[in-house]
Amino acid sequence: MNGDLGKTAITFGVFDLLHFGHFELFRRIRELVGESGKVYVMLQIDEMIAKYKPGCKSVYDFTTRQKMIETLRTVDKAIPYDVVGVEAVKDIGFDVLIVGPEHTNERFQRLFKWCAENGKEVVTLPRTEGISTTKLKEIIKDL
């Protein structure tokens, strides 16, 4: 799919404490869809982070995370979502779902099936080695 112009890609995440791994992900997605394509970031709302990741407190609230992501030239729009699934994406016009290797739970499996049934491509991109939000928070905590 490399450089397919005019395609729209989506990816899911919290994207708290933006770091090099996030920037690389967004850059790779932009590379895949081309400059005339669209990159939409499905950004999890605060209430669901607290529910699905107990004990994992966000540094930035949703509005701040959305503003930060939307200032990046590689991203066209950050869209709120509560839970990963068909309901979150069915009304969004997209061609490609971008996921990481860790996205294997049942919700993602149902979404992958829906994508296959609806002509949407699913692309798995590797994580950027050596960096993660969790690792960053641990480093900051130890300072």
Region locations from a protein language model:
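Nucleotidyltransferase catalytic core that binds NTPs
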Residues: 1-143
